[in-house]
Amino acid sequence: MSGQRKGYIAKVSGPVVIAKGISDIKMGEVVYVGNEGLLGEVVRVSQDSFAVQVYEDTSGLRPKEPVTATGKLLVAELGPGLMGRVFDGVQRPLKSIEELVGPFVKRGVKVNPLPRNVKWHFKPSVKVGDKVSSGDIIGVVQETPLIEHRVMVPIGVSGKVKEVVPEGDYTVEDPVVILESDGRVVELTMKQEWPVRQPRPYKERLPSEVPLLIGQRIIDTFFPIAKGGAGAIPGGFGTGKTVTLHKVSMYSDSQIVVYIGCGERGNEIAEMLKEFPVLVDPKSGRPIIERSIIIANTSNMPVSAREASIYMGVTIAEYYRDQGYDVTLIADSTSRWAEALREIAGRLGELPVERGYPAYLPDKIAEFYERGGRVKALGSPERSGSVTVLGAVSPPGGDYNEPVTIHTLRFVGTMWALDTDLAYRRHFPAINWLKSFSQYADIIERWWVKNVSPEFPKYRRRALRLLTVASEIEAIASVVGEGALPDDQRLILLTSEIIKEGFLRQTALSGEDVFCKPEKQYWLLKMMMDFFDKSYELIRKRVSIEEILRMPEIYEMMRVKEDERGLQAVKELYERVMAKLDEIAQRHGVTLAVEAEEVVA
């Protein structure tokens, strides 16, 4: 069929090709363009012509070269062999391309996404006579030491099991189960295909109630994201977006990470590929690459493939979600994707709106973030999975009032606002605690109450309030000087400095502080807020703040996070700090009992 449906190029405009000669072409259909057969997708159909978005470099294409229709939509190939591999934006494995044509991706190169020659050990979980339908698990494959791949009945297929292969080694193309469906025989292999622009169906959407723990204190404690939630990380150049997202992919407690490098620098992807095979997953002791899939679409790759990479990544994430896994999908950066949309829209002559972006930009952004969520999957056995979507946004000049940032914030539940001033002060992660927000915080507090401490919500709220009050006092102190402030305000500034240095600031490179467990986060915050409460009561009882400032434990509170003894060191320091404050109180003959709720309620 594909040999018969041929047209020809009428016009080439950058990544957009106008073609003619195929009367029954459909929107979204995949076509091969030119003598080299460049992959493209139909994005507009007119009465006598159609526009193709080409996913490869169009240099050298000429009018009258052939355009061949395939009759298929742009699909992701799903099955064993995805995990631990690196793909380009249209799911071509880069390692296979290197073996085939060398270090540079040549135009028109065609490689199967899943290896056809690798045999996987398949264990069937159905027997002859069983009735199966969409989403039912028919067998399992140990894809990597960390991930068990659950082979599912493709969506839209059902029937009675007629034949099952015995446990053994098979390729992704070998039939493993044969069904009888409405008098037809259907062969099921370990691979299936799914159109990337169409969300995969599920049985039921579930509430997002469990936190995605990342080990970064400012995120887990103050601005958490739920499994199945959506988050944005806007920030200017050099504020640490990519490093923050790398930490999420390395240390988050999701079972699978899909990382989309969309239009970012090639060196950053190269750095990831160097780190991931070496870095060890703290929970399993295995390399992190064994639970990761990387889609590399760097800034020097074709612009139009950026859009395909976003949809390809989210489709793969949904596939593993349907198997019952918690997946984190990271898109770095969605701004580059939006720029690609802008360029394609301009080439097609669509009406530009704000800053040249097309009018449908908000719909595209919403479509992407709404594919996240925690769901009950189709089929049996019953299982639930989640896709947590995290997108970096790179506003030009750090301006949050540009369209991509504004529209993104409408559709996400968490924003980690990266601040240029904090980054220049070497305060990392440079997340601004006054601009960031999390709509999941109240729901996730229940998890902290149940698993860590019932007092956690109180400490969290009061610490955030103290930081807000401190920022107002800092503005006054910059005019009159800190020495001119009353003692209670000086104490607020001191505690705020302890929280910033000892809690919010965190190394991303090595040592004890690279990942902080929930219990340690709670005890650090408890120590700092209890220090504030007791010190505030001393000041109210006319004890000078100079007495408190002389405590050597103040500097220890800022450094204990790096102590290799971990939680034990924090608890020991807490006892010493409380004992020291009690000693000061005893010396001045005052009683300590009251929390400083009225100052930072």
From Swiss-Prot:
Lipid bilayer topology: Peripheral membrane protein
UniProt keyword Oxidoreductase, yes or no: no
Domain of life according to the entry: Archaea
Alphabetical list of SUPFAM superfamilies matching this protein: C-terminal domain of alpha and beta subunits of F1 ATP synthase (SSF47917), N-terminal domain of alpha and beta subunits of F1 ATP synthase (SSF50615), P-loop containing nucleoside triphosphate hydrolases (SSF52540)
Reaction equation(s) it catalyzes: ATP + H2O + 4 H(+)(in) = ADP + phosphate + 5 H(+)(out)
Database matches in PANTHER family: H(+)-TRANSPORTING TWO-SECTOR ATPASE, V-TYPE PROTON ATPASE CATALYTIC SUBUNIT A
Protein name: A-type ATP synthase subunit A
Organism name: Thermofilum pendens (strain DSM 2475 / Hrk 5)
